[in-house]
């Protein structure tokens, strides 16, 4: 500074495309310390804040970032209700400090972990710039992928704060964008201090670092069970299919209760790399992730689909009973993941093909994984079986059925597919052993959270929720036997063949899947 000069200074506000402002600072103030521990208190608390001598503290209680015009700290702040306090230090010759933030929950206990997120109203509810509102433009604000800064704190179920850092957020998902309670993606960014969230958020994952997280409002399940996607993911445990781990939590937005969410892993190159054990940064950056059939440019979520398109064209035009053709496919495709994916989704009755997903790291095979499976356990409909088991020349219904059809033309793979169906039912769908305990875990937790959640977001009653969950459990109980019948018919199995494949499985179902 001045513009074109050789003196480097900090500016209070960026001026992209314009001349720099006149006022710059050679250094910035030191972030103040909120001396009183964030967390849960039975009654009102006095919150003390300190900063180096000569620096003035300004603070807010509405979630916004303090400015030089914010309320000046003159002594401990009396907090009598759940409140977010954000503080910055200022001095005449220094740029304002980074922002300290702490949430104080007053007579507001929780049985589950709590995430407190806060940011300026301009990023949330402003009609021009806020992502939580429709706005005045032709495209709703919440449909835009605007990414804004946000401060987050994570408190474990015992009330201890385990994480506090600046990050960014975006509105995510599809069906929930227009809801009052939206799903939010959280992203750790180096520009805000760290490119990871360093905590073990999920009991069934060994990971302690995440590049992003998902606050999932349960999307299309928000007025039904509020757990289907999470429950069904856990039921798939042991099949080798990646699914997004889940933890029911409560969220506070700018200090206000904002309902039950399921904290989730965010399915992206980083979480898939953790799952697959890939650690090379270059390989992670080169990950290919596709959706639906994977054959259209619009199906590419990350990387490229060139290799996948070549593979699909190959299976459409080659007989896999030729060993060399079969080898070409099995060298490029993780067949176990395909079979496990299809069988699992047929059993749960997942008809939502918009969420078909597959990935590949350099030098690896194309691998299917589970993503947004909350459409499962909603009916006794046979249509999901039809979606997956179409003839090789049939029109796709959102799933790349060509490769499955080609493999099932090979007798040993048809045999393996049927045997694998029996194995998956026995390992994952014996109701009282493997399904009911997972449902009950979520029922016990979410059932306690619902009364307050419903007050905040009406539209679901406890009575209806109970009925919806019971119905989902009944579909999970009864569909395995029905799938056996459908497959037996579609593959033209004789009575002897059905017994050979499924007699033991049916015997177990008669023991564990009865009301």
How would you describe each model-predicted region?
Residues 150-158, 227-241:
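Zn2+-dependent metallopeptidase catalytic core
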Residues 60, 69-70, 98-100, 127-130, ...:
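Short, solvent-exposed loop/turn and secondary-structure capping segments
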Residues 186, 331-381, 476:
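Active-site acidic catalytic loop and adjacent metal/ATP-binding pocket
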Residues 55, 238-252:
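Short, well-structured beta-strand/strand-turn elements
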Residues 362-489:
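C-terminal catalytic region of ATP-dependent kinase domains
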Residues 1-168, 367, 485, 495-514:
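Short, compositionally stereotyped local motifs that mark structural "simplifiers"
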Residues 199-210, 215-220, 224-225, 256, ...:
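ATP-dependent phospho-/nucleotidyl transfer catalytic cores
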């Amino acid at each position: 500074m001045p513009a074109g000069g050789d003196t480097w200074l900090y500016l209070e506000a960026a001026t992209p495309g314009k001349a720099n402002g006149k006022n710059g600072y050679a250094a910035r103030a030191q972030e103040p310390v909120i001396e009183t521990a964030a967390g849960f208190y039975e009654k009102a608390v006095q919150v003390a804040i300190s900063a180096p001598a000569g620096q003035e503290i300004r603070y807010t209680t509405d979630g916004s970032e303090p400015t030089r015009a914010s309320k000046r700290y003159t002594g401990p702040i009396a907090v009598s209700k759940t409140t977010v306090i954000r503080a910055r230090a200022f001095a005449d010759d220094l740029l304002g400090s980074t922002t300290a933030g702490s949430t104080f929950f007053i007579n507001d206990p929780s049985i589950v972990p709590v995430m407190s997120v806060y940011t300026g109203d301009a990023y949330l509810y402003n009609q021009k710039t806020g992502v939580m509102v429709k706005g005045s433009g032709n495209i709703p604000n919440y449909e835009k992928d605007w990414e804004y800064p946000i401060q987050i704190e994570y408190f474990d179920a015992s009330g201890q704060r385990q994480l506090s850092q600046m990050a960014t957020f975006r509105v995510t998902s599809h069906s929930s964008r227009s809801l009052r309670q939206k799903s939010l993606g959280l992203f750790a960014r180096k520009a805000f201090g760290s490119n990871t969230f360093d905590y073990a958020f999920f009991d069934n994952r060994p990971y302690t670092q995440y590049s992003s997280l998902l606050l999932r409002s349960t999307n299309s399940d928000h007025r039904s069970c509020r757990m289907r996607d999470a429950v069904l993911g856990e039921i798939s445990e042991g099949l080798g299919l990646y699914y997004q781990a889940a933890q029911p939590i409560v969220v506070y937005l700018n200090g206000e209760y904002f309902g039950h969410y399921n904290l989730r892993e965010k399915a992206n190159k980083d979480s898939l790399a953790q799952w697959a054990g890939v650690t090379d940064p270059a390989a992670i950056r080169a990950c290919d992730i596709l959706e639906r059939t994977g054959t259209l440019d619009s199906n590419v979520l990350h990387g490229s689909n060139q290799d996948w398109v070549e593979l699909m064209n190959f299976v459409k035009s080659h007989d896999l009973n030729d060993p060399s053709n079969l080898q070409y496919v099995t060298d490029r495709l993780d067949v176990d993941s395909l079979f496990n994916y299809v069988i699992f989704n047929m059993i749960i009755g997942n008809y939502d093909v918009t969420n078909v997903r597959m990935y590949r790291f350099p030098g690896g095979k194309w691998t299917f994984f589970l993503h947004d499976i909350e459409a499962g356990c909603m009916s006794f409909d046979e249509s999901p079986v039809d979606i997956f088991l179409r003839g090789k020349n049939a029109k796709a219904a959102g799933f790349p059925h060509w490769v499955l059809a080609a493999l099932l033309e090979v007798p040993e793979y048809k045999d393996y597919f049927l045997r694998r169906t029996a194995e998956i039912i026995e390992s994952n769908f014996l109701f009282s052993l493997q399904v009911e305990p997972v449902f009950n875990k979520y029922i016990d937790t979410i059932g306690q959270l619902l009364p307050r959640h419903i007050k905040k977001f009406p539209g679901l009653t406890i009575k209806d929720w109970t009925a919806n969950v019971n119905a989902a459990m009944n579909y999970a109980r009864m569909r395995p036997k029905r799938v056996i019948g459908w497959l037996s018919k579609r593959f033209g199995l004789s009575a002897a063949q059905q017994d050979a494949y499924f007699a033991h499985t049916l015997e177990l179902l008669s023991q564990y899947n009865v009301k």
